[in-house]
């Protein structure tokens, strides 16, 4: 395979769906044994690790934000979805909202999941955090 420039890679990513990008990130992490988690998530998990070992093992550190329905204010929900999910175009955001229930964010920190849920609910959506 020919070497791709950064611009070529970005163009290829722009054409991918959110789920395809998520799969790509997972495979990239596995292949290169790295993580794409934000440094904030690591800092937030730090104090929990200092507590009792049994509690740290049971406490969930990664959450999925699932859009159950858009409600009556679909346009507002689409705007918030574009804000929350980086790099998402208007058509992709609309398709995501129309296809609910769909996962919007996967394996994010609790603060990010709660923030996304609050924004989506304020826009009129029904959201579940798992």
Curated annotation (Swiss-Prot):
GO terms for biological process: translation. The gene is rplL. GO terms for molecular function: mRNA binding; structural constituent of ribosome. The keyword Acyltransferase does not apply. Keywords: Ribonucleoprotein, Ribosomal protein. The keyword Ribonucleoprotein applies. Belongs to the bacterial ribosomal protein bL12 family. PANTHER family: 39S RIBOSOMAL PROTEIN L12 (PTHR45987), LARGE RIBOSOMAL SUBUNIT PROTEIN BL12M (PTHR45987:SF4). It holds the Pfam family Ribosomal_L12_N. Forms part of the ribosomal stalk which helps the ribosome interact with GTP-bound translation factors. Is thus essential for accurate translation. SUPFAM superfamilies: ClpS-like (SSF54736), Ribosomal protein L7/12, oligomerisation (N-terminal) domain (SSF48300). Homodimer. Part of the ribosomal stalk of the 50S ribosomal subunit. Forms a multimeric L10(L12)X complex, where L10 forms an elongated spine to which 2 to 4 L12 dimers bind in a sequential fashion. Binds GTP-bound translation factors. GO terms for cellular component: cytosolic large ribosomal subunit. It comes from the Bacteria. This is Large ribosomal subunit protein bL12.
């Amino acid at each position: 395979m020919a070497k791709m420039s950064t611009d070529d890679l970005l163009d290829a990513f722009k054409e991918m769906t959110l789920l395809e990008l998520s799969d790509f990130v997972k495979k990239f992490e596995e292949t290169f044994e790295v993580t794409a988690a934000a440094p904030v998530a690591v800092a937030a998990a730090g104090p929990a690790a200092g507590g009792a070992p049994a509690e740290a093992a049971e406490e969930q550190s990664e959450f999925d934000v699932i859009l159950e329905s858009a409600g009556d204010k679909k346009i507002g929900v689409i705007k918030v979805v574009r804000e929350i999910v980086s790099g998402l175009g208007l058509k992709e955001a609309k398709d995501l909202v129309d296809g609910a229930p769909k996962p919007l964010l996967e394996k994010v920190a609790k603060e990010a999941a709660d923030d996304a849920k609050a924004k989506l609910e304020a826009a009129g959506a029904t959201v579940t955090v798992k």
